[in-house]
């Protein structure tokens, strides 16, 4: 698959440049094709997608797949708006993707990012994530055993709703 081959090449370069050690429990999430259009609801601050990280902080202690690196390939650039904007350590970094660009960045804090509104046309992109399998913290697993899986899941959902601003 050409898209996966492009991701592999860019990720290997990124990993070498940033001296990242590949872990045996890392894997790809799988590609998802998406688009933003000028028909998407525009929020008050002119962002189509609000600032966020792809790592879900509220689920950090739970077992399961977690986001490590965000990888986005841009298919076209014949649209107006749609810049990706990073808010990193208090600085705003704006990038207008060009067709063929692949952006790779850590999925967690401090790499908050959002997408500006499309004013004309459609923006097509392919998203993929490098994920890792996390067994869960000892505390989380102990509580699941102590309270039972069903009750603990309900308690965690309450905590997530309280802790996660999304």
Show where each model-derived region lies.
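Fe(II)/2-oxoglutarate oxygenase catalytic core
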Residues: 1-102, 110-166
């Amino acid at each position: 698959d050409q898209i996966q081959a492009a991701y592999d090449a860019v990720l290997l370069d990124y990993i070498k440049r940033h001296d990242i050690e590949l872990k045996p429990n890392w894997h790809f999430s799988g590609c998802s094709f998406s688009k933003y259009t000028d028909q998407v609801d525009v929020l008050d601050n002119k962002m189509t997608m609000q600032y966020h990280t792809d790592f879900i902080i509220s689920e950090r202690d739970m077992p399961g797949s977690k986001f490590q690196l965000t990888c986005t390939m841009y298919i076209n650039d014949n649209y107006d708006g749609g810049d990706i904007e990073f808010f990193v350590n208090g600085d705003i970094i704006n990038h207008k993707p060009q067709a063929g660009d692949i952006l790779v960045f850590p999925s967690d804090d401090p790499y908050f990012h959002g997408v500006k509104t499309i004013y004309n046309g459609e923006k097509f992109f392919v998203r993929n994530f490098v994920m890792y399998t996390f067994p869960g913290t000892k505390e989380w697993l102990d509580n699941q055993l102590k309270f039972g899986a069903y009750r603990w899941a309900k308690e965690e959902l309450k905590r997530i709703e309280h802790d996660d601003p999304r």
